[in-house]
Amino acid sequence: MPLRCIGCVALLIATAAPACAKELATQPAVSSRLVLSRTERRLAFTGDPIWKLQLQSPGTANLDFDTVTGKAHRQTADRHRSGTRAPLPPGTYSLGPVERLGPRDPVELGPIWIGLEPRFPTGRGHLGIHLDPSANRNSNSGTLGCVGLIHRDEMLKLASLVKRRKVQTLVVLE
């Protein structure tokens, strides 16, 4: 009798497997993404608000990076208007490739650029993720609206992880 039951289970699994495989193939794959959110913290010297950039990947612990976005005194400006120096508008963005910057690129962008393309209508453009080498140091602290990592080693780590985990999405929360 036990032999028959084992055979029935094997038969059941064999006939159900193709249906399960088809069902799994039609479900969207869960992928890594970045999420940017406000914190209550500020940089000690310049007063820039610190935003948390979190890398979320299925099956691994979330990684947090301290960033700035916009200028300290422009945090409440219209986030959809160009030239306001406000933080990124809330919404979903597509990430471009990780690009190394060279000596002819602006020093305030640091060594790496990851372009951002809004997936919603906005007056903002030329946005990206980069190092803010002036963060908490002088009047250049903050960005014109991009996401600026505060620490060089974290920017390099983030760029490596974005490439390795094939991150394609940034979600900016209110």
Give residue ranges: language-model regions.
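Sequence contexts marking disulfide-bonded cysteines in secreted/extracellular proteins
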Residues: 19, 145-147
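A short acidic/glycine-rich loop-to-helix N-cap element
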Residues: 138-145, 159
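Cell wall/extracellular polymer interaction/catalysis modules
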Residues: 20-141, 153-154, 166-168
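Polybasic, low-complexity, intrinsically disordered segments
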Residues: 14-23, 174
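A short beta-strand-loop micro-motif that forms or neighbors metal/cofactor-
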Residues: 160-174
